[in-house]
């Protein structure tokens, strides 16, 4: 199970990220590891690691990143909600901030959110760059070569019936359940989520609530607090003219927040999006798709029944599948992992560790839970079949 970046929804506020100057450039390098990471300079000198998130309207900065780099701004308190069942207080920076996404791509923001991103998403994130970041001209996300490429041609691509509304992009998606029924409608295109998620309004649908092969999970939802739901094997999903087969969908059971919103059916995350090269044209309000070499390759790691959140000194259990071996062995949400296979976690690169995991790998975990220290051994068994 992979970590999930929250979707931020602001109350009575609209964030903007505007262009300072646009000089022709072919592409910008990104890093793709379930999320899209950008190298960003703040105020022309301070390097930051930002997530490119089309589910977010503006720009956000991590509060610790600001404090460590002496970024002192005028702020006011705001309320935000997101994936999960609660709201939090954050800061709205009212000063103008300049960002550089390459030597030739400058932006500025006049309304920037500042919040504790590292405690919600992980120690490596310094900020979020939202949907308007590159909206001034057509661009293509290439998940394979890990680039954002500015282009002038859509030759070889298929148009999808996209809807641009209130700084969000919606695409039609049809999900085919194992009982033959279809759930179809508009889903938000969200590069800030590593998962495609069906909103909780549809949990009671025939073929979902009564599916015998679904698996319940518990997860941290970022800004909105804990976010729970089920993993559900489905026959296929149709996106435009393209059919993606044998998928594991996520179905939310949240009662509040973005995943309980009745105005759209769910979100399309990177687990589906990374099967394609995707062209965005915000001026014409159009989206084009072309399958890449990952198309319909089963990338699901169906043994990852636990997910970790890296604080630096320890890993926090940020997600777990109920009745998986990890759960049966006693691992619980918010457990603090101190050592893995006799190696302190501060000496382990979490991303590489997770990427290298294989089915049936054995883990020896040293855990701190409140004032107790626990040792557990387990195998990463496959917990669900697509």
Predicted regions and their residues:
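Bacterial Sec-dependent N-terminal signal peptides
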Residues: 1-27
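Pepsin/retropepsin-fold aspartyl endopeptidases
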Residues: 18-386
């Amino acid at each position: 199970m992979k970590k999930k970046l929250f979707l931020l929804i602001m109350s009575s506020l609209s964030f903007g990220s505007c262009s300072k100057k646009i000089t022709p450039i072919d592409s910008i390098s990104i890093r793709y590891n379930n999320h899209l990471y950008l190298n960003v300079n703040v105020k022309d000198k301070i390097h930051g690691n930002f997530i490119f998130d089309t589910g977010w309207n503006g720009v956000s900065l991590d509060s610790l990143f600001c404090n460590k780099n002496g970024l002192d701004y005028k702020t006011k308190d705001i309320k935000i909600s997101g994936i999960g069942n609660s709201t939090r207080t954050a800061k709205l920076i009212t000063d103008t901030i300049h960002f550089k996404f390459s030597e030739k791509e400058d932006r500025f923001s006049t309304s920037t959110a500042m919040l504790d991103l590292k405690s919600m998403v992980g120690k490596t994130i310094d900020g979020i760059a939202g949907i308007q970041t590159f909206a001034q001209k057509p661009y293509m996300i290439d998940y394979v070569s890990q680039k954002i490429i500015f282009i002038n041609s859509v030759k070889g691509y298929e148009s999808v019936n996209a809807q641009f509304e209130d700084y969000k992009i919606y695409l039609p998606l049809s999900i085919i359940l194992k009982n033959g029924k279809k759930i179809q409608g508009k889903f938000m295109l969200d590069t800030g989520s590593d998962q495609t998620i069906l909103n909780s309004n549809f949990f009671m649908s025939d073929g979902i609530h009564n599916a015998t092969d679904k698996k319940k999970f518990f997860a941290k939802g970022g800004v909105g607090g804990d976010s729970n739901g089920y993993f559900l094997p489905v026959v296929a999903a149709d996106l435009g003219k393209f059919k993606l087969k044998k998928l594991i969908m996520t179905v939310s059971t949240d009662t509040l927040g973005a995943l309980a919103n009745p105005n759209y059916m769910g979100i399309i995350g990177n687990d589906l999006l990374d099967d394609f090269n995707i062209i965005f044209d915000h001026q014409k309000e159009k989206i084009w798709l072309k399958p890449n070499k990952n198309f319909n390759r089963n990338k699901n790691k169906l043994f990852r029944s636990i997910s970790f959140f890296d604080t630096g000194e320890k890993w926090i259990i940020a997600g777990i599948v109920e009745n998986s071996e990890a759960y049966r062995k006693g691992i619980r949400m918010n457990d603090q992992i101190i050592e893995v296979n006799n190696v302190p976690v501060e000496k382990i690169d979490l991303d590489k560790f997770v990427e290298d995991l294989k089915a049936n790998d054995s883990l020896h975990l040293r855990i701190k839970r409140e004032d107790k220290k626990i040792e557990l051994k387990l195998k990463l068994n496959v917990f669900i079949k697509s």
